[in-house]
Curated annotation (Swiss-Prot):
SMART domains on file: WD40
Protein name, entry field: WD repeat-containing protein 19
UniProt WD repeat ranges: 11-51, 52-92, 95-134, 137-175, 273-311, 317-356
GO cellular component, as recorded: cilium; cytoplasm; cytoskeleton; intraciliary transport particle A; motile cilium; non-motile cilium; photoreceptor connecting cilium; photoreceptor outer segment
Annotated Pfam families: Beta-prop_WDR19_1st, Beta-prop_WDR19_2nd, TPR_IF140-IFT172, Zf_2nd_IFT121, Zf_IFT144_1st
TPR repeat residue numbers: 736-769, 775-808, 840-873, 895-928, 951-984, 1020-1053
Role, per record: As component of the IFT complex A (IFT-A), a complex required for retrograde ciliary transport and entry into cilia of G protein-coupled receptors (GPCRs), it is involved in cilia function and/or assembly. Essential for functional IFT-A assembly and ciliary entry of GPCRs. Associates with the BBSome complex to mediate ciliary transport.
Length: 1341
């Protein structure tokens, strides 16, 4: 809010002053103080006149048009009238001797009401000079009053009475009030649901505390509104809106109340605007603003939303308090008086005047100030003081023009200075002016004057200095105009847009529109313009091709248009009205031709006028004389997109595509990174014929097909042909056809329609473009018609398609003719055509058509001719032509046809033929039935049942054997047919339960069946069979009971079954029962320990099984069964390892010694005496574990050591044999030799080779298994018995025991099994293990 001026005259100081704005125009301000003078100032603070009075001014008022100011003064009976038009003062005698106290002009007409201190009234008609004195209107001083729009006058006086009079002075209403009234006003109040435009409600402040409401039509129901005492006195109030009242209270409260029924007096807004006091409230309906003053400040509220504070003006220098506020009618100026006698005038609303030239703008910043700025290019703003308050502003490249009425002042724009050039007077009131670099064009009264701005600038011919448009003989009226760098363009009421080329000084173009052109807006280059016609429709006009394009969704309220000044967005423009900005884009090159699209709209803030559009930023001028930039919602993508949601990004993508901003769209697509967005961008590129960019997008998408297609067409120069291809790519085929036909390659339209299979269109095009293609198109069209069921037209097109010189094509057409002839009922023609045709498929298809038409004979003939024997036989069957069926049967593969034929032959009693046919049809039940019932061949029937597992067939065979009395076979086939109950009953009746039990035990049978058999055997006291079937049905207790009752002849098998039973039952009671039995607790006869071992294994009690296994092995070893002992220990070792249970060291040691013994035989047999000797030494060192073979083992040890050269070892064991307990048991064959060794000892011995420990690399003898270095037990090789080596490691793939890779391979050359697990093995199955660390880790654990 800018202060325009302040008035502070010495004569006013110390006392409050009165002032009054001129109504309507607000050009004058009348002010008076205590100096007996009314001074009249203009709106810029310059004194224009004054009225001298005989005493202090009582009151003053302007008439409704602002032409006459009426003033009354103390000590005078005259009314002073100042004429604003003539600047003259006249006096009017009131004709009454009373001192005047009140004066007011009417709202309608020129009536002046004057009241006196004695209550008399004078109504003066200024137009007719008629005076109407009314005596005694009030009994005391008239203090206030108000006119309404129907010329009713309401008056209030000190007599506590309100009267309502007409313009003749007649009283039509009067009402008493409780206290002295003040501030009377008329308004339209809504006290009920009636809507009336008449001002029929009177309001007044009564006693400064109460608001009185009085309805003229309901005089008996006045309303008194009282307020809180804390608010203080009512200072002033105003009606606003739809029946609302705004009230200011002396203690600073600002209130809004409603007068709507039934909420009369309800507070709808309250604010403590001022802390200490409030002195005035003023309302501007034009601005929709309310102002309050107090506490040295003015606060301005927006009436739309009272909570919004529009502005605050502080007056720190006013320390005596503020006075009265008042707006001009147009809301431009707000005046404030103060208690010390000063007056301040503020600019609250400027006329929104501005102009732009490229990126330079000029706009009004004060009543007498224009600012020129170029924010885009960073030029500092220049302020220009002007001589008059302008009504138009124009800016050019080098000049500024301002003016009013018929005069314009021109200024030259320098770098940082503005120089006044000249002023020009035109022949009429100027509506608008436009500037060129050299010329100005002023529009006034339907004419344009084009003239040089600076005459000395150009050495122009005289006729080029100025020119008036239109010519004298042209009767049109110019409504709008514009100047570009080259042209003067103007539009007329007859609808013609003229282009005047300034350089050649002549017209170069005109366009005729059906109705008048009222506004036009060229783009910065002048190559396009938007114009608005008298119907308020908008169009884009291109003078280059003289074409116009209607602007879609063009609002009739549009005030103006701005083109985008950003050089990269040439086709974008906005149209604006008071509320919205609509963004449009003119797309010159699209596959649909040039067109205008609406890109979106943006809300325009209140009282903003757009001046300049640059890259989506709209610079607007405001009422306050400032500029404000808003960003179009259609250009939201220009902001930061860092944390934008995908939904918003997709919306931005749509905006960029509408505005053809493909680079921005590319960036958004990269952020979205989804195929849909890239596809939208690619489609838009095709639409705008941006082929290179479309290729780039398609390549990014990986759309190889599109890239290849676009690469092929990108070099096409024919616009229509290229557009046609692109339209086709976007599936707009009708448009593509039109474009192709308009191009220099119209046959492309035919090719497209053929590719799309639009045969009807293709035929029409072929007649004109390629008649030789008609037969080929006819054939394709016929195929499509046939598919849709239009056989008549299909036949016609097939016939048209026959060329006579293209065999393959003609065959297709003839096939079509054959099929369509049959479908049309011409069977003979169609069938003959099909029979003559070489195609098998045609014969099949025609046969199918004939079969559907119930023409079986012809159908079968065609099928047979086409070698479709199954179909032919099927149709012959429908004809009952069995002879033909028989002929075709060897060629028929369909079981269904064989079945039909078989049934027919069976009915005829020809069973051998029938059975063959049934076999071909895979109908095994029927085959079995015929073999049993008719051909008496049960062997064949049984064979088929066993082969096919047919349940029904098995039943039939069972019945057959039952009739023969062969119950065993009958039971077998009953079980096979799942008839277990019948089989059981039959077995029971004929004492064949063993057979039934054997059969049922091999089948997947239910527990009930097993239980039935078990119960039967239980009754028969056949314990083993009873136990077996109780086990199968899960009754473990009963099964165990029967197994333990078995006689001794079945003892071994029964105990095995008992162990299996307990293993499955996992019942501790049953386990203990069986253990007692095995230990001999029940019968005093302990059973073999192997059964206990098997029991523990079945129960998965591996530790107990291991202890038992050691005992068994020991017994076997003692008995000399070393292989058995080895196998028992090995199996237990493997089971414990599988269960990840630690191997007992005793078991591992025993297994190692037994295995060493087994290796002796292998190595001795192969002649490797050293390996045999080493293993025998290990065995002999543990000879106590071989008690039954001590002497033979020691003898073998002596012999093998001797053979291997281990003389000292041979001597040691020979000496052992010489002990008395062994000496006599030595085999006579070796006795002398051994005695000789002892008598003549040879202690020489080959030293045993040393190899590294796999754990610590300590060198120790190769047969030593305990490392002295790391104290670890080293794994031994199952092929040699030596300790393992890290770099020569393998293992048996079956048992997982380690072996030396090189030695195991040598062993397997002579042996075919693993020496440990006895599984078959060959050397190719061995794999050398390079990293044996995991095996060593297992050994350590």
């Amino acid at each position: 809010m800018k202060r325009v001026f302040s008035l502070l005259e010495k004569s006013w100081l110390g006392a409050p002053i009165q002032f009054a704005w001129q109504k309507s125009s607000g050009n004058y301000l009348a002010v008076t103080g205590a100096d007996y003078i009314v001074k009249i100032f203009d709106r810029h603070g310059q004194k224009r006149s004054e009225i001298s009075l005989p005493g202090n001014c009582v009151t003053m008022d302007w008439d409704k048009d602002g032409d006459i100011l009426a003033v009354i003064a103390e000590k005078s009976s005259c009314i002073y009238l100042w004429d604003a038009n003539t600047n003259k003062t006249s006096q009017l005698d009131n004709g009454m001797r009373d001192q005047m106290s009140f004066l007011l002009w009417s709202k309608i007409g020129s009536f002046l009401a004057v009241g006196t201190i004695k209550g008399n009234l004078l109504i003066y008609n200024h137009q007719t000079s008629r005076k109407i004195p009314v005596l005694g209107k009030h009994t005391k001083k008239i203090t206030c009053g108000c006119w309404n729009s129907e010329n009713l006058l309401a008056l209030g006086g000190e007599d506590k009475m309100i009267t309502v009079s007409n313009q003749e002075g007649d009283t039509i209403r009067q009402t008493p009030v409780k206290s002295e009234p003040s501030d009377i006003k008329f308004s339209m109040s809504k006290t009920d649901e009636r809507i009336s435009s008449a001002e029929n409600t009177i309001s007044a402040v009564v006693g400064k505390k109460m608001l009185f409401l009085f309805h003229l039509n309901e005089p008996d129901n006045p309303v008194d509104l009282e307020f809180q005492q804390a608010y203080g006195n009512i200072v002033c109030y105003s009606w606003y809106g739809d029946g609302y009242i705004m009230i200011g209270f002396s203690r600073g409260t600002f209130l809004a109340i409603s007068t709507h029924f039934p909420e009369v007096g309800q507070e709808i807004f309250k604010a403590r605007d001022h802390k200490d006091n409030l002195t005035s409230v003023a309302l501007s309906q034009t601005l929709n603003k309310a102002a309050t003053c107090g506490d040295n400040c003015i606060k301005i509220h927006d009436l739309t939303e009272l909570r919004d504070m529009y502005a605050i003006i502080n007056l720190d220098d006013e320390n005596k308090g503020l006075g009265t506020l008042s707006w001009t009618d147009d809301g431009q100026l707000l005046a404030l008086s103060t208690q010390r006698g000063s007056l301040h005038v503020f600019l609250t609303k400027l006329p929104i005047l501005g102009d732009a030239c490229h990126t330079r703008i000029a706009y009004l910043t004060s009543l007498l100030e224009v600012t020129v700025a170029n924010l885009i290019e960073g030029e500092p703003p220049i302020t220009v003081s002007v001589d008059v308050e302008p009504t138009f502003v124009a800016v050019g490249l080098y000049h500024l023009a301002v003016g009013m009425n018929n005069r314009a002042w021109f200024y030259v724009l320098g770098e940082n200075v503005v120089k006044k050039l000249k002023d020009v007077e035109y022949l009429g009131t100027v509506a608008s002016i436009c500037l060129h670099s050299d010329y100005a064009a002023a529009l006034f009264e339907g004419k344009i004057q084009l003239h040089l701005i600076e005459n000395e600038m150009l050495d122009a011919q005289e006729e080029r200095e100025t020119r008036l448009f239109p010519a004298v003989d042209d009767k049109c009226r110019i409504l709008c105009h514009a100047l570009t760098s080259d042209f003067l363009i103007y539009g007329t009421d007859t609808g013609i847009i003229h282009y005047f080329f300034i350089e050649d000084w002549q017209f170069v173009n005109d366009y005729r529109h059906p109705v008048g052109v009222k506004k036009l807006f060229p783009d910065p280059n002048g190559t396009r313009l938007v114009f608005i016609d008298e119907k308020s429709d908008g169009f884009v006009y291109c003078p280059v091709n003289d074409a116009t394009y209607e602007i879609p969704d063009f609002s009739p309220t549009i005030k103006g248009v701005l083109w985008e000044n950003w050089p990269m967005d040439k086709g974008v423009f906005i149209a604006y009205d008071d509320d919205k900005v609509y963004t449009y884009a003119f797309h010159k090159d699209t596959i649909q031709g040039s067109k205008v699209i609406l890109a979106g709209s943006t809300k325009l803030p209140f009282s903003h006028k757009p001046l300049l559009l640059y890259n989506g930023e709209l610079t607007c001028q405001t009422q306050s004389g400032k500029i404000n930039s808003i960003y179009l919602s259609t250009h939201s993508f220009l902001g930061s997109m860092k944390d934008t949601e995908p939904t918003d990004l997709r919306q931005m993508l749509t905006q960029t595509l509408l505005l053809k901003r493909f680079s921005d769209a590319w960036d958004i697509c990269k952020m979205l990174n989804d195929r849909t967005s890239w596809s939208e961008l690619a489609k838009a590129c095709l639409h705008h014929m941006e082929v290179e960019f479309a290729i780039r997008v398609s390549r990014t998408m990986g759309d190889v097909g599109t890239v290849m297609s676009l690469e092929q067409i990108k070099g096409i120069e024919d616009y229509n042909l290229l557009a046609g291809h692109l339209a086709m790519f976007t599936n707009d085929f009708n448009l593509a056809q039109d474009l192709y036909l308009a191009s220099n390659c119209p046959v492309a339209a035919l090719e497209m329609r053929r590719d799309l299979q639009h045969w009807d269109s293709a035929l029409q095009l072929a007649k004109r473009l390629a008649p030789d293609q008609i037969p080929f198109i006819s054939k394709e069209y016929a195929i499509q018609l046939e598919f849709t069921g239009d056989y008549v037209n299909a036949l016609a097109h097939y016939e048209k398609g026959i060329t006579g010189d293209n065999k393959e094509h003609d065959e297709v057409c003839l096939a079509g003719v054959a099929q369509m002839s049959i479908r049309m009922g011409d069977i003979r023609r169609g069938a003959n055509q099909a029979l003559k045709h070489p195609s098998r498929v045609l014969k099949r298809d025609c046969g199918a058509i004939l079969e559907n038409m119930k023409q079986f004979s012809e159908a079968a003939q065609l099928y047979e001719k086409g070698q479709y024997y199954d179909r032919a036989a099927s149709v012959y069957i429908r004809c009952k032509n069995w002879a033909k069926v028989g002929e075709l049967l060897p060629h028929v593969s369909s079981p269904k046809i064989h079945l039909q034929y078989a049934k027919a032959k069976e009915a005829d009693g020809r069973y051998k033929e029938a059975v063959v046919a049934y076999e071909n049809a895979k109908q095994w039940n029927s085959v079995i039935r015929i073999y049993l019932d008719h051909l008496n061949n049960p062997e064949k029937a049984v064979s088929i049942v066993r082969e096919t597992q047919s349940l029904d067939g098995a039943k039939m065979v069972a019945r057959f054997f039952l009739q023969l009395g062969d119950y065993g076979s009958a039971i077998q086939f009953l079980v096979l047919s799942k008839c277990n109950n019948e089989a059981f009953t039959l077995a029971q009746q004929h004492n064949k339960m063993e057979i039934y039990a054997d059969i049922i035990g091999a089948e997947d049978t239910t527990n009930e069946d097993y239980q039935s058999i078990a119960l039967y055997f239980e009754g028969e006291k056949r314990h083993f069979q009873a136990g077996k079937f109780f086990l199968l049905c899960g009754q473990y207790s009963r099964a165990l009971k029967h197994f333990l009752k078995c006689p001794s002849s079945e003892d071994n098998v029964a105990i095995e079954m008992a162990i299996e039973t307990v293993g499955q039952a996992k019942d501790e009671l049953l386990t203990n029962q069986l253990i007692d039995h095995l230990m001999g607790e029940s019968d005093g006869m302990p059973k073999d320990a192997k059964y206990l071992f098997r029991l523990y294994m079945a129960l998965k009690q591996y530790r107990e099984a291991a202890r038992t296994a050691i005992i068994i092995a020991r017994e076997e070893q003692s008995a000399g069964n070393y292989r058995n002992a080895h196998d028992v220990l090995f199996s237990m070792y493997a089971e414990l390892k599988a269960q990840k249970i630690k191997i007992p060291s005793e078991m591992a040691t025993n297994l190692m010694i037994l295995h060493s013994y087994i290796l002796v035989k292998i190595h001795v047999k192969s002649g490797d005496h050293m390996k045999g000797a080493r293993m025998l030494i290990r065995v002999a060192n543990n000879i106590s574990k071989f008690p039954s073979h001590i002497v033979p083992i020691l003898t073998s040890t002596v012999i093998e050591c001797h053979r291997a050269g281990l003389k000292n070892s041979a001597f040691s064991f020979a000496a052992m044999l010489m002990r008395p307990e062994y000496r006599n048991k030595i085999d006579a064959k070796y006795k002398k030799k051994i005695e000789a060794m002892v008598r003549r000892p040879d202690t020489s011995e080959t030293e045993e080779a040393t190899t590294p420990c796999p754990f610590c690399q300590f060198l120790l003898p190769e047969c030593e298994l305990l490392c002295p270095g790391c104290k670890n037990n080293i794994p031994y090789c199952i092929a040699t018995g030596r300790h393992m080596l890290k770099d020569d490691w393998t293992m048996c793939p079956h048992c997982g025991f380690p072996a030396l890779y090189s030695e195991f391979k040598i062993l397997l050359n002579s042996e075919s099994t693993c020496p440990m697990c006895s599984e078959r093995l060959n050397s190719s199955q061995l794999k050398k293990i390079t990293d044996c660390s995991q095996y060593l880790r297992t050994e350590m654990e």
